[in-house]
Amino acid sequence: MVCKCDCKNQNCSCNTGTKDCDCSDAKCCEQYCCPTASEKKCCKSGCAGGCKCANCECAQAAH
């Protein structure tokens, strides 16, 4: 299982204590999303439309 980053705590939800979590914007789309596809920056979580930022590598359109 891939370790998912918890950006709020900057820890992995499946942290085994042997590896740091990558909490960069690109790895933390659950925390950074944009209301529209035209947005060029990452926004705070809770907005509609899911992650559409150029610097966010999202596996899902929304969560």
UniProtKB/Swiss-Prot annotation:
Q: Which domain of life is it from?
A: Eukaryota
Arranged from A to Z, the UniProt key words for this protein are: Cadmium, Metal-binding, Metal-thiolate cluster
The reply to whether Secreted figures as a keyword in the UniProt entry is no
Q: Name one GO molecular function term.
A: zinc ion binding
The question of whether Metal-binding is a record keyword is answered with: yes
Which InterPro entries did the record assign?
Metalthion_nemt
Name any Gene Ontology BP term: response to cadmium ion
The UniProt record describes its induction as: By cadmium.
What's written under domain? All cysteine residues are arranged in C-X-C groups. These are thought to be the metal-binding sites in other metallothioneins.
Membership in a protein family: Belongs to the metallothionein superfamily. Type 6 family.
* Function (record text): This protein binds cations of several transition elements.
Write the protein's name: Metallothionein-2
- The organism's taxonomic lineage, starting at the top: Eukaryota, Metazoa, Ecdysozoa, Nematoda, Chromadorea
